[in-house]
Amino acid sequence: MKVLVINCGSSSLKYQLIDMDGEKVLCKGLCERIGMESSMITHEANGHKATTPAIFPTHTEAFAEVVKKMTTGEGKCINDVSEIDAIGHRVVHGGEKFKSSCLITDEVIETLRELSPLAPLHNPAGILGIEAARKVFGNIPMVAVFDTAFHSTMPPKAYMYAIPYEYYEKYGVRRYGFHGTSHKYVAYKAAEYLEEPIERLKLITCHLGNGSSIAAVDQGKVVDTSMGMTPLAGLMMGTRCGDLDPSVVNYLKYTLNITGHQLDEILNKKSGLLGISGVSSDKRDVEEAAAAGNKRAQLASDMLNYQIKKTIGSYIAAMRGVDAIVFTGGIGEHDAIARAKICHHMDWLGIRIDTEKNKHPQGDVCEITAWGAKVRTLVIATDEELMIARDTKEVVENK
């Protein structure tokens, strides 16, 4: 089975074609600046990668160009679009309506529209991509894979906010969690590496990048996660503030005399590592500035590492123990200094990492546990596209 994985933004289209017999990537690419004059497509297949200008008034034309790239020229990876057996779409927010991946129907699209207020920056773009793909690919089965679905096993005591209950009943105000596809992939990958059924494991998965979240996975089910109703909550991130005293919102709004939209921009795009350091939203730049003596950059780094350590500790308490901690994402996979600082002084919990292994992790799964430590510590390269493809294959085969 060949599965085309799609991740649509408002002006972008990321794709990957995977042959599920061996889970081999046949091609991948990115359409950028859709709807703008300077739109382009980057396509990679057969060891050949090229970026070419193109005209994409809408996502429909972008999909048509993707088909052209896949079936002709140096980037050809299939003879005809009919070779694609299924299409998996990443959808950010499934609310309480979608607790697992599902076949896309007219009714599903309508429900996604109803959920758009919960993810106004992401869900409309996902719907746009689904509708454009239907025009280009016709009757090829399509599956929606939700970022929120893996977290749907959280109990009410973990997902409810302590505000009037009717706001949950009427408006769906609660914790949902995100990065679920990544958390699911690395949790199952960890279980495979540890040679234990996931149903016997207590795992803490740390997806750390420009957007970051942590999940407590007990016996294969998420029991808590750091992001909330939106991806703004939890840890501080590249440009997002993370958890905040709700009264700060009103205080800033009236003190600065700004609109709710303007404040939303500040909290989502001007805060986090960027807001504290004043240097960059990129952790690498922040660490470089900190090493050069920039105190604000050092503070930003210290804050993030502290918040991650604190969250890990709270989840160990919630699960009454932990078997393994998994680091993934841009920071989680590549920032040895961050991993070392996060795990420092956690010996009393059984967490201790090997300094040399931590400096140079090798392969898709690398264990950096120090000799004698009770808790296993792993660095795992996430693969959200493959997880989406697996879910898509499972849904289509069981329809």
Task: Kindly give the residue locations of the regions a language model identified.
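Extreme N-terminal starter segment of soluble prokaryotic enzymes
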Residues: 1-4
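Short glycine-rich, Thr/Ser-proximal phosphate-binding strand/loop in the N-terminal lobe
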Residues: 12-56, 228
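Short beta-strand-loop/turn "lid" adjacent to the catalytic site in phosphate-handling enzymes
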Residues: 70, 74-122, 143, 149-158
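Glycine-rich phosphate-binding loop of actin/hexokinase-like ATP-binding domains
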Residues: 150-254
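Adenine-nucleotide phosphate-binding core of ATP-dependent small-molecule kinases
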Residues: 265, 272-276, 283-318
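Internal helix-turn-beta structural module
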Residues: 298, 302-318, 323-326, 332-398
